[in-house]
């Protein structure tokens, strides 16, 4: 209704419910529902919504004229990236409201308002919010975007993940060390992700023992791999990190570094095929924010990319891959 002032709401004969995530819904309930997925907003879309609707709405609610408080585009973008972590704009509106409330206090102290709340027109003051003074109103930044490494790394690969609050980059680390265990997994992984890790491990053993990469045949008898995904307090699951895990393991085993400006997503099979994934729009947006230059995408997702707006893929080199050999050729510094 905010974005479509002339929208007519026709009441339907069945109930409609909205959810931020389907994970917590029971399977019998899901079987009786038609699921309509709505993608999250991009940074530019959030910026447009804030400028055209949210700022004006909060100015009116707090009794402020546009001549008294101005929020720059750069400040709004900093709020979106540094003070919110969501697919929508609810928290963004809360942060704008917080700025307005603090601005009212400062304006009152400056004599802009009389004791009865009326405007003192003799005092001419305008508060301008920029990215330079934003912390005075909202405090320190809450969220920081992980940026790409400057140099190639061994055993560290940047994957892409979909969450209920949008896309995120997912750093996967693998260390190879002397030991008798095959594979150790840490990082609060779900069952599906653990299975993906085991598939990746089996694939890496198969291609290294076949002689494609120079690894001693006794290597896996004498070494173990430890795979970790940082932010251990955050649960993680799903198969789309398969290609990332495989690349990180092979890099750790062979000592071949991985390009720091490459991100990837895709499910992998035991034979190295790369399968389609979901949440591609959000994942690509996360890759752009992290400063990635190249993104490896399953070839089966070509049709999904064609449906995306150009602004989402601008600045990204998308490489479609159908198997792990293509992933490794694009990711490893050979």
Segments (PLM) and residue ranges:
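AAA+/SF3 P-loop NTPase mechanochemical coupling elements
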Residues: 2-21, 69-71, 221-223
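Conserved beta-strand segments of the P-loop GTPase G domain that flank and frequently precede/overlap
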Residues: 37-39, 228
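Conserved catalytic-core segments of large NTP-driven translation/proteostasis enzymes
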Residues: 72-174, 180-186
